[in-house]
Swiss-Prot record:
Residues 81-89, 170-175, 230-232 are vacuolar. Probable vacuolar iron transporter that may be involved in the regulation of iron distribution throughout the plant. Signal peptide: none annotated. Residues 1-59, 111-148, 197-208 are cytoplasmic. This is Vacuolar iron transporter homolog 1. GO terms for biological process: intracellular manganese ion homeostasis. It comes from Oryza sativa subsp. japonica. One of its GO terms (cellular component) is vacuolar membrane. GO terms for molecular function: iron ion transmembrane transporter activity; manganese ion transmembrane transporter activity.
Length: 232
């Protein structure tokens, strides 16, 4: 009887040891899965940087700078086609800078604020009306004010490039050439920067930005030149 009992104990002990050794290995996998499902934030991953809010104002800054450069350069070239005076081109470029910066800021503020309302309502529904862990989730929402300021400042910075390059040049041909040259350099720079940040092809992005800017300036110049020729 003692031999049989020892045999049963000896036969059962390896399985018990296997279960004891298997449990510690299974627990970290479950913890890792829970951490991954919670958002992928770990102590060594970025130090808790809020990339959602950063991407929001970075996108607004890039779009604002590109819009400011293309719109003001096209406006100055178009006005120069109809009215070749330096004052007309300078005033039109300055008006485009101020109006465009205000428009971009207001539009970005309204759109981001609407996005925040939608995300906040979604978070509230997911929490089921509870206030637990609400502070951490609310911090992940993008800031409408930051996006509006970034959009306005970037638009003004992009618009200032063609304005300063051609607004104070007296000869008409040199003025238009300066605006086009400064705009081309700025467009190429924005294309390369956006491609580098996004991990895309640098050359293709730069060419795409250049072609788009040249097309906008050419269309504006052609339309206003047509109006100027007919005395409108």
């Amino acid at each position: 009887m003692a031999i049989d009992l020892g045999c049963h104990v000896g036969c059962a002990s390896p399985e018990t040891k296997q279960e004891e050794t298997a449990d510690p290995t299974a627990a970290p996998v479950v913890v890792d899965d829970v951490e991954a499902a919670a958002g992928g934030r770990r102590p060594g991953d970025g130090g808790g940087v809020n990339y959602v809010a950063r991407a929001q104002w970075l996108r607004a800054a890039v779009l604002g700078a590109n819009d400011g450069l293309v719109s003001v350069a096209s406006l100055m070239v178009g006005v120069g086609a109809a009215n070749g005076t330096r004052r007309a081109m300078l005033v039109s470029g300055l008006a485009g800078l101020v109006a465009g910066a205000c428009s971009m800021a207001i539009g970005e503020f309204v759109s981001v604020y609407a996005q925040c309302d939608i995300q906040a309502a979604q978070i509230e529904r997911a929490r089921g009306g509870k206030d637990a862990d609400g502070g951490e989730e609310e911090e992940e929402l993008p800031s409408p004010t930051m996006a509006a300021v970034a959009s306005a400042l970037s638009f003004a910075a992009g618009a200032a490039l063609p304005l300063l390059a051609g607004g104070f040049v007296r000869p008409w041909a040199a003025r238009v050439a300066a605006v086009c040259a400064a705009s081309s350099l700025g467009l190429a720079g924005f294309g390369v920067a956006s491609a580098y940040l996004g991990g895309a092809g640098v050359a293709r992005s730069g060419v795409r930005m250049l072609v788009g800017g040249w097309l906008a300036m050419a269309v504006t110049y052609g339309v206003l030149k047509l109006f100027g020729m007919h005395g409108v």
